Amino acid sequence: MSTKAVRSIELARELGVKPLEIVKFIEKIRNIQFKKGTTNIKVEPDEIDKIIQHFKKEAKLEKIKEKEEKPVELKKTEEIKELEEKKPITPKIIEEEIKEEEELQLPGRFRREISFEKIEKIKPKPVPTKIPPKKFEPKKWLDIKEQKKVKDKNKKEEPAVTPSTAPRKKSIKIEEGTTVKEFAELIGQKVPDVIKKFMELGYMPTINQPVDIDAAQLVAESFGIKVEFSQTQELDIIEEVEDSPELLQPRPPIVTVMGHVDHGKTSLLDAIRKTKVTEQEAGGITQHIGAYKVTLQGKDITFLDTPGHEAFTALRARGAKVTDIVVLVVAADDGVMPQTIEAINHAKAANVPIVVAVNKIDKPEANPQRVRTQLSDYGVIPEEWGGQNIFVDISAKKRIGIENLLEMIALQAEIMELKANPNKPARGTIIESRLDKGRGPVATVIVQNGTLRIGDAFVAGVTYGKVRAIIDDTGKRINEAPPSTPVEVVGFEEVPQAGDSFTVVEDERIARQIANTRAQKKRLAEMQKAQRLTLQDLYEKIKEGEVKELNLVIKGDVQGSVEALKKAVEDITHPEIKVKVIHTGVGGITESDVNLAATANAIIIGFNVRPETKAQDLAEQLGVDIKLYSIIYEVIDDVKKALQGMLEPEIKERVIGRAEVRAVFKISKIGTVAGCYVLNGTISRASDGVRVIRDNIVVYEGKISSLKRFKEDVREVQAGYECGITIENFNDIKEGDILENYVLEKVPVKGL
């Protein structure tokens, strides 16, 4: 067995096969699908032996086939020889006829006099009269092409068309999403010529970029062609077809857990799944939607955990759209709170039944009856009081009443008779999305109808793609996902918006066409909206007397958090200043974000992300303020305080140095030592802290416990030198991580 990983190209060279064959075989082993055209991938040691055995077997089979075929070939050749001997034609004449060079030199008339059937097949009669002899001289393959062209001309009786001549089309039809290349083919012009025309109009398109309809009309008119615009019938392509009752099969219920912050939603799911989800959340608050599948008494139930803070209204509204049953968690000691009322309104708006879980009944101050009374005021009435809502008293912490709650959920699902057709293309909803460095754009999808399979082409909002991998809630790769299954999908062209519909279509071409159409419609709507806002703002400014605006750029680690943060800050009101979010995005803070903030005089807010080194330097040069947070409450509080002029003297962080981890050493009794190279500034042991940054996302923040150079303890290490660093209570350091060393300084407040 091999102990070392190799590249697929090297292995293919050794086995004498094509690299693509190796890649296809690895796809079968790993149960995944690589991007089209991938030939050079890493082959693990345990896969090498399987590949060698597979291709050796194929080679043996080929040899056996060759042996079996050989005697048949010999018989055929003998038969041919016998036939040739029986022919009345003398061998000498046959040899002269087969020689191509001599035959080509003979005049046409003489060749016809001694021609036999074989010669007539090789050279048809019209050829000698039409083609001059000089065309036979350079290369014989050119003669064949020329002869074919002559034949086509004789058949069609049309003059030859050169590439430079103008097209005969007087009008063409183009659809939304037509690329520059497709447009050039339609009007019969070369792509570079068409791009030049677009550039003259002030557009700078690429070959695969969709054309602007107005610009395309002007370009076509310059070539004497009229353009007719035909809209893509998107609704016809992805229209929902009602399934006949015999095709429908029972599906698991999708249950959304809702409730006020700290009332125990995640703890309830934790009790069901017997895992420690709560401890992993920043500040004990759920930051992203989680989707889990639980099997109870042989039946599956899919749970969605929506964040409980009121800032996550948008997320919870999306959760209500995809759910079948809402479990409303209310703490027995706190009672009904603002977010509880909000959750009730979302569930009622979506016409979803509510099962109430009265949590924390183990506490001395718990009063479950008070909760029932309060909820009845909002139309959620217990069954025992003559209402339609099931109430269950539970304690998620002590696992009291959990089994009873699950039985009630299963009972509610049975009453609803939930069904779907698994034998059709999948449809679903994007629950969460993010940009993964290794896998590209990925999204959590709830499949609501049909079955999602690897290789399916799909549309999701204004983006599209092809399913390359499907990962279930346990992290396992699967081939297909039936209805009511939460999965992570890899294969998006761009990061989709959370809440977008996910629809499988016939092929990638249709998917791209629909996505481009939607993108163009969205772009036009935004342009019109921007124009309306400009006029309104102008009127408001005249009326209110130059109202100031606080412009913000928000970047986060996932789309859901960014949307929630945007809504939260935009809801903050102030009599003199308006809060306006001018840009949002997923991923680290880039130079583009800094330039935008500088132009709009905006502040950048980073939520669980870090700025790139170049972006940080540019921000310092341009004087752009970057604020970094990990908990949403802090962002809201800081913005409110800044608007009210109540900010306390600020303790500002100053980054004094950055180091790159180039090697990792594990030493007993000490832990993990990071072998680092100081990129810039100074790494100091006396600093206030150090951050471990992986792919522009903070994975840990703590203090340096030791700093060494050549086995000697040192106070600091300058840029350009190597050193060994250990971090307090953290051993999960990896090669390529960036260690950011900082100090805290008191800075006079200027306002946010």
From Swiss-Prot:
| Residue segments, region G3 | 305-308
Which parts of the sequence are annotated with region: G2? 284-288
Region Disordered, residue ranges? 148-170
Residue intervals of the tr-type G domain? 250-419
Region G4, as annotated, extends over 359-362
Biased composition range(s): Basic and acidic residues:
148-159
Entries under InterPro entries matching the protein: EF-G-like_DII (IPR053905), EFTu-like_2 (IPR004161), IF2_II (IPR044145), IF2_N (IPR006847), P-loop_NTPase (IPR027417), Small_GTP-bd (IPR005225), T_Tr_GTP-bd_dom (IPR000795), TF_IF2_bacterial-like (IPR000178)
Where, per UniProt, does this protein localize? Cytoplasm
Q: Which Pfam families does the record associate with it? A: EF-G_D2 (PF22042), GTP_EFTU (PF00009), GTP_EFTU_D2 (PF03144), IF-2 (PF11987), IF2_N (PF04760)
Here the disulfide bonds are none
Signal peptide start-end: none
A Gene Ontology cellular-component term: cytosol
Cytoplasm keyword on record: yes
Protein biosynthesis: present as a keyword of the record?
yes
Q: Which residues of this UniProt protein bind GTP?
A: 259-266, 305-309, 359-362
Alphabetically ordered keywords of this record: Cytoplasm, GTP-binding, Initiation factor, Nucleotide-binding, Protein biosynthesis
Q: Where is this region: G5?
A: 395-397
Transmembrane regions listed in the UniProt entry: none
In the record, biological process GO terms are: translational initiation
Could you give a GO molecular-function term held by this entry?
GTPase activity
Location of the region described as G1 in the Swiss-Prot/TrEMBL record: 259-266
Task performed by this protein: One of the essential components for the initiation of protein synthesis. Protects formylmethionyl-tRNA from spontaneous hydrolysis and promotes its binding to the 30S ribosomal subunits. Also involved in the hydrolysis of GTP during the formation of the 70S ribosomal complex.
**Which family is this sequence assigned to?**
Belongs to the TRAFAC class translation factor GTPase superfamily. Classic translation factor GTPase family. IF-2 subfamily.
Q: What is this protein called?
A: Translation initiation factor IF-2
Q: Which species? A: Thermodesulfovibrio yellowstonii (strain ATCC 51303 / DSM 11347 / YP87)
Which gene underlies this protein? infB
